[in-house]
From Swiss-Prot:
Functional pathway: Amino-acid degradation; L-histidine degradation into L-glutamate; N-formimidoyl-L-glutamate from L-histidine: step 1/3
Protein name as annotated: Histidine ammonia-lyase
PTM info: Contains an active site 4-methylidene-imidazol-5-one (MIO), which is formed autocatalytically by cyclization and dehydration of residues Ala-Ser-Gly.
Family to which the UniProt record says this protein belongs: Belongs to the PAL/histidase family.
Enzyme Commission code: 4.3.1.3
Xref: PROSITE patterns: PAL_HISTIDASE
């Protein structure tokens, strides 16, 4: 399969560009109109390196060692030593699509023409993406300030022929992987090592991955929530557009509209409009637009933050428009840390309200006539009893992981870097959190579809019938107790892959861009 290549325009890269790289394992290259700006900044750095004036990152030590002047003859060694000494990551490798996103984001940052690297480095990153030389980057080791030093050092090391890289699915010594791909390691010039590792690209890539996954889950939650509403014979009256317009939150308005459209044409819904003795549904049914809509608004706010950060220069020092080279602090990932914490809250709440809907459906005291645990023969069979327990376990695990990472800080590097963002692990936890959420929503899908089928011969809406058909291809109806783990896995995969979301007609589910 031919990979999609995204042409990046630094300063104007979109979420859609980045999502294509993440979801489709795409490649990326810079628009060639940015070459001149890159070369201009590189020439300025070369000029400084040839002189005697000390400039941080070019001919000085790093961090607490910034006051030590480095001889011109040692500038290349300085950059090589920087990368090797900073390769201190631990843990399992980051997923390949996350690393591809890291590399693309680094291209964007370098492409702004403020980092002072040669075009040779940019072309090597592009070629590595194209040919599938993907650095092995351990998941842990960054505190999210002075950039994501350790993880980005592992990326830079591969460019030098050091460390490890995945090539054709296998981890290889970096030099071997480059050679197999027909690529040559680079010898870093002045400031280039620092430009490669001094940035927020790892934290931002992980936060983007979490955002994309959380938005997919948010869309799926509206589908499973609509199914649960019909399974429980819940009222669609609380989804009336005027209710949500009177409050005014865009996410709530969009979520309410999605639920209405998903339920349109349901025989089940029509069957109990008249003569239903219930006055109001529990909040997990009635307040879906308010909860899922608030989560959608939060994710959209995160999207704006991360789109800005994806286009940012987060290197230090920077070559400014007047050709001066100035030290700053753009490497501090506080905006990304906040965005990751916000995403975690949304993930947690989407799962929390979905889990309560599962609990409602399996409880005959709440489900308005459905059998206990959605089993046709309760007692002899336990039905979805323990599937609901699993959803509760995953919900509580996500609550624990949702504790803000950004409120923590610790001084590092001999107190030179005395306040840090913790953005990297704050963003990294979004991956297991969304895995849990996909599983919760998969369990809701199993429960709700089982419940809808038990309402037969009445049918749900045409849109939701399409969802049921897709689910039943991989998970048959639960007639008797059986080994359940494969069913839960298959349902979660339908959510995670986007297969469930893609069954819904265009324009119904809310997009990430408001």
């Amino acid at each position: 399969m031919t990979m999609k290549t995204i042409t990046l325009h630094p300063g104007a890269v979109t979420l859609a560009d980045l999502a294509a790289i993440y979801w489709e394992n795409g490649t990326a290259k810079l628009d060639r109109s940015f070459d001149a700006g890159i070369e201009k900044a590189a020439a300025r750095i070369a000029e400084i390196a040839a002189g005697n004036a000390p400039v941080y990152g070019i001919n000085t030590g790093f961090g607490k060692l910034a006051s030590i002047k480095i001889d011109a003859a040692d500038v290349a060694t300085l950059q090589r030593n920087l990368i090797l000494s900073h390769c201190c990551g631990v843990g399992v490798p980051l997923p390949e699509n996350v690393v591809r996103l890291i590399m693309a984001l680094k291209l964007v940052s370098l492409g702004r023409g403020a980092s002072g690297v040669r075009l040779e480095l940019v072309r090597l990153i592009e070629a590595m993406l194209e040919k599938g030389v993907i650095p092995v980057i351990p998941e842990k080791g960054s505190v999210g300030a002075s950039g994501d030093l350790a993880p980005l050092a592992h990326m830079a090391a591969v460019m030098m022929g050091e460390g490890e890289a995945f090539y054709e699915g296998a981890p290889l010594p970096a030099g071997e992987a480059l050679a197999k791909a027909g690529l040559t390691p680079v010898v870093l010039a002045a400031k280039e090592g620092l430009a490669l590792i001094n940035g927020t690209q790892t934290s931002t890539a992980l936060a983007l991955a979490g955002l994309f996954r959380a938005h997919r889950a948010a869309q799926a939650a509206l589908i499973t929530g609509a199914l649960s509403t019909d399974a429980a014979m819940g009222s669609s009256a609380p989804f009336h557009p005027d209710i949500h317009s009177l409050r005014g939150h865009k996410g709530q308005i969009d979520a309410g509209a999605a639920l209405r459209n998903l339920l349109e044409g349901s025989e089940i819904r029509v069957s109990h409009i008249e003569g239903d003795e219930r006055v109001q549904d529990p909040y997990c049914i009635r307040c879906q637009p308010q909860v899922d809509g608030a989560c959608l608004d939060l994710l959209r706010q995160v999207a704006r933050t991360l789109e800005i950060e994806a286009n940012a220069v987060t290197d230090n020092p920077l070559v400014l428009s007047d050709n001066s080279v100035v030290s700053g602090g753009n490497f501090h990932a506080e905006p990304v840390a906040f965005a990751a914490d916000q995403t975690a809250l949304a993930i947690c709440e989407i799962g929390a309200i979905a889990q309560r809907r599962v609990a409602l459906l399996v409880d005959p005291a709440l489900s308005y006539g459905l059998p206990a645990f959605l089993s046709k023969k309760p007692g002899l069979n336990s039905g979805l009893m323990i599937a609901e327990v699993t959803s509760a376990a995953l919900m509580s695990e996500n609550k624990q992981m949702a504790h803000p990472a950004s409120v923590d800080s610790t001084p590092t590097s001999a107190n030179q870097e005395d306040h840090v963002s913790m953005a990297c692990h704050g963003a990294r936890r979004l991956l297991p959190m969304t895995d849990n959420l996909f599983a919760i929503l998969g369990i809701e899908a199993l429960s709700a579809v089982q419940g809808v089928e038990l309402r037969g011969p009445l049918k749900t809406s045409p849109e939701l019938q399409k969802v049921i058909a897709v689910l039943r291809v991989v998970v048959p109806s639960l007639e008797e107790d059986r080994y359940m783990a494969p069913d839960l896995k298959a349902a979660a995969e339908l959510i995670a892959s986007g297969a469930l979301v893609s069954t819904i007609s265009g324009g119904i589910l809310p997009k990430l861009e408001a």
